[in-house]
Amino acid sequence: FILGASEKLENTLKEAYDMFKPEFIGVVGTCASMIIGEDLKEAIANANLDCTVIPVESHGGFGEGDNTEGAIMVLDSAVEYGIIPREEADRQIEMLKKATEIEKTRGMAQGKYIQPNFGDNKEEVAKKIIKALRDNKKVAFVLNAKKETSYLFADILNFDYREINPENKPIIVANLDENIGLSRIRNHAVNIKQELKTDIDYITGGLDEYPVTGKAAADYLKENPVDLYVVCGVPHAFPVEEIEGESIAVTDGPRLVEPLKDLGYDNVVAELDAHSKTLGTDKIVFSDFGGMIRSAIDWK
């Protein structure tokens, strides 16, 4: 039973199927619909579509209220309807819970108001990186990015170091394992690796494992110390306080700049609109900081 809306939901499902012929459709019941007791499954059964329809009943007040709880509900429902195996869902749920913990302890969800900050001057930070490479300093770039936003943060790695110092290749560490995650996530890793203009020295894990691949990257740098390192994507998941050397973070959140400085990063650069710029893409997209590095190479 859906109070006055069951027929509308059935018609919407039929229209969506007729228009797009999808293999899967997701139906999410939100606060108002769940409070009054709507039965999503009945409407789905009545629509009788030739595809798998996954209902997710989500509303405010559920569980602890973390923004990852809804994603966990989707994973559980996907298992129930045979979309993904239980083992894969459990792995992703573990990552989501670790991501929540990182945000609460090291990121934006620490419980206090954080003033937006657009970070350090991109030109000055780019010059610092280029000077270090020219001066034969050991430099590392760590890509610890989240899913599709990796298309933007990978652009920061996409410069030709030989134009700066052909004898000083930076170390590249990245969470671009193409064998981890669902096919869409694995394909992101494949696409980026094909477009990168440099070899990757160490792969820390998959693109949905950013809550734990930061530590893996740090462990690698402990064994291969550098003078300067740049962490792109989710830099607050990287234990900067444990790694010596000059540190630069590149983040997509103006409200992450202050927490990253508090963690110990010497410089923080903010890339704006990472999610909107990478929505639906399958290619590396231009980043302001990546563009600045490439431009500054020719400056003396």
Each PLM stretch: what is its role?
Residues F1-K300:
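An N-terminal assembly and electron-transfer interface module characteristic of large anaerobic redox
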